A protein has these predicted regions:
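Catalytic binding pocket for nucleotide-activated donors in carbohydrate/polymer assembly enzymes
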Residues: 72, 96-198
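Conserved catalytic-core segment of nucleotide-activated headgroup transferases in glycan assembly
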Residues: 1-123
């Protein structure tokens, strides 16, 4: 949806790029909605008419922050992290989508989630979770699937992990791209620790 907003003013484009880059540096708090002024929303609506339904409790700011901008941030962040990890490690990605921008990734196509994905989770050295930033504290279901299959999980910070799991014992959390790469490298070199956590 974000990329469909082709008629944004240069100011709005720059502003949105700036706040998205700032959000990508902060884990554990999603602040985008707070930064969307009336003028920015009006400019975005001009390019992408989006309104909450009559019986909706969400505001227009919430819709743009969570449905449009959060998804764009996730796309940018996932692409950047996958590019970085694929430059250092043999990396496979299971997706039905083509990934020409990730030339060093081995795109394995899609697999059946019920029959084949548990095998992938269990037998992958490291399974990555990069959550939508608009998921403020919750744990994505895929994380439970990975850990339930005995897979090793390296995930971005989500507050609820601390309520249900012990980081470093049940899973490993990263706080930045550098931390992500360092922990990936460490656990690939320390099989026993990785297997114990998995």
């Amino acid at each position: 949806l974000f990329d469909r907003m082709e008629h944004l003013s240069d100011y709005t484009k720059g502003y949105l790029q700036g706040i998205m880059q700032a959000q990508m540096k902060v884990y554990g708090y999603y602040f985008i909605e707070e930064l969307l002024s009336k003028e920015i929303i009006e400019d975005m609506q001009h390019s992408l008419p989006l309104q909450p339904g009559n019986d909706s409790v969400e505001s227009t700011e919430w819709l743009f922050a969570h449905y449009v901008i959060a998804r764009k941030i996730a796309n940018l962040e996932r692409t950047a992290l996958l590019k970085a990890v694929s430059e250092h490690f043999n990396t496979k990605l299971y997706t039905p989508n083509p990934t020409p921008e990730l030339s060093q990734i081995h795109n394995m196509g899609s697999v059946d989630y019920q029959r084949q994905m548990p095998y992938v989770f269990k037998n992958s050295a490291i399974n990555l979770n990069i959550s939508l930033r608009s998921i403020r504290s919750g744990i994505p279901l895929r994380c439970f699937d990975i850990m339930g299959c005995g897979g090793f999980l390296l995930s971005n910070y989500q507050g609820d992990f601390y309520e249900h799991f012990v980081p470093g014992e049940d899973l490993v959390l990263f706080e930045s791209q550098e931390d992500f790469l360092n922990k990936g490298d460490y656990y690939l070199k320390h099989d026993n620790e990785r297997r114990q956590i998995a």
